[in-house]
């Protein structure tokens, strides 16, 4: 506790000392009547200022701490705003590292970026996700230049220019949160709509509106093998037996989490239990899917066990002809693809060592669309692994 010299307004009386009207302190000379005097003289009083409790973010010697409403340092896993952070036993916020954190007795691998934001990593090994993949693991790349988001954009634009048709690309470097959005437009999403179906299901499970065990058998095939019947039946479950009501609830959920270019209006074929309610087509965009995977990565769509479950399903997606084809065999990729007519889309989280990022590409009428996605993916991975932040 620090002493403060303050001037007072006083009067004198026989047998009495100074009578204090109020105290002044600080650069603004604020009147603070609640301070208590510990010594008095004719015109000066020495008082003690009550020690103030720290609250919120504090930076000391370059280290970040957070204090709760009781003035205590936060430790362990904490949600601040809409993102998770992790604080060591001494209260220091951890940054820029991989860690394994235990949630309710379950060890969960995570990556912490330069801002201390914690992102979740799939626990499915790449070897398990890529059964039979015999590509040699390349040697480590040398980091020899500074990261520049404008360079990334120019590289993407150069690749896009070599292919015809319509392409939309979204990119986010998860360590810096620097983003690129090129040619974003609503498109028919094909099976990418299943991302929203999965998260709507988990959301309704957590709010107690649907029985997880009753529909659990649908979500794996829907994501891993893109089974349309499972999607159609899950939508029916989301609507308490009415698939169109399920679609309405999906749309409400998408709007609530900011996916305002995404909506479902019908089922998917080929598959049983197809449904439709009019002439509108399902719709989404590269930006929406990119933001979806960002929220999933940061644990903003579901609780920790369900977040981990969804990431593990996406890591096992069996279509690896697009973006996955441009990645080394040992690099994790949690994603979803969609294909129908002239459309082919792919997007998700690339777990490049120390430099995770999100990439989503929507294509319409692009010849050699898989070659485009593979080239795009190879370029982004190589850039991430050879640049310094």
Which positions does each model-derived feature cover?
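Structured C-terminal helix/loop/strand segments within mature extracytoplasmic catalytic/sensor domains
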Residues: 15, 23-28, 39-40, 132-157, ...
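Short, conserved catalytic-motif segment at the N-terminal edge
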Residues: 164-186
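Active-site-proximal beta-strand/loop segments in catalytic clefts of secreted hydrolases
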Residues: 172-174, 222-227, 234-238, 266-269, ...
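Active-site SXXK
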Residues: 177, 186-210, 221-222, 359
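Extracellular adhesion/carbohydrate-binding repeat motifs centered on closely spaced tryptophans
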Residues: 2-134
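Mid-domain, small-residue-enriched loop/turn segments at the edges of structured enzyme/sensor domains
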Residues: 235-298
């Amino acid at each position: 506790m620090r002493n403060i010299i303050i001037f007072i307004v006083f009067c004198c009386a026989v047998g009495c000392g100074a009578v204090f009207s109020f105290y002044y302190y600080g650069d603004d000379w604020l009147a603070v009547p609640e301070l208590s005097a510990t010594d008095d003289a004719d015109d000066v009083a020495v008082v003690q200022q009550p020690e103030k409790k720290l609250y919120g973010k504090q930076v000391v010697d370059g280290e970040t701490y957070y204090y709760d409403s009781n003035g205590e340092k936060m430790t362990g896993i904490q949600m601040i705003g809409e993102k998770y952070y992790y604080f060591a036993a001494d209260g220091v916020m951890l940054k820029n590292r991989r860690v394994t954190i235990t949630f309710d007795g379950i060890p969960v691998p995570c990556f912490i970026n330069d801002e201390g934001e914690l992102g979740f990593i799939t626990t499915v090994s790449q070897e398990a996700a890529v059964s039979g993949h015999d590509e040699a693991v390349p040697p480590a790349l040398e980091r020899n230049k500074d990261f520049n988001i404008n360079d990334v954009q120019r590289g993407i634009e150069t690749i896009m220019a070599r292919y015809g048709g319509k392409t939309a690309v979204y990119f986010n470097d998860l360590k810096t949160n620097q983003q690129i959005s090129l040619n974003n437009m609503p498109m028919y999403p094909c099976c990418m709509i299943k991302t929203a179906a999965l998260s709507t299901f988990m959301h309704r499970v957590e709010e107690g509106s649907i029985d997880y065990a009753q529909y659990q058998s649908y979500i794996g095939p829907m994501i891993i093998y893109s089974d349309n019947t499972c999607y159609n039946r899950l939508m029916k479950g989301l609507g308490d037996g009415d698939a169109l009501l399920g679609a309405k609830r999906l749309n409400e959920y998408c709007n609530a989490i900011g996916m305002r270019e995404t909506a479902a209006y019908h089922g998917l074929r080929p598959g049983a239990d197809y449904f439709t309610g009019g002439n509108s087509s399902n719709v989404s965009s590269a930006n929406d899917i990119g933001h979806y995977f960002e929220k999933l990565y940061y644990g903003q769509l579901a609780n920790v066990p369900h977040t981990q479950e969804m990431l593990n399903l996406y890591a096992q997606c069996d279509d690896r002809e697009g973006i996955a084809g441009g990645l080394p065999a040992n690099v994790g990729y949690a994603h979803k693809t969609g294909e129908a007519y002239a459309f082919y889309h792919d997007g998700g989280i690339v777990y490049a060592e120390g430099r995770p990022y999100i990439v989503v590409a929507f294509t319409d009428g692009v010849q050699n669309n898989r070659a485009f996605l593979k080239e795009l993916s190879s370029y982004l991975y190589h850039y991430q692994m050879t640049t310094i932040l």
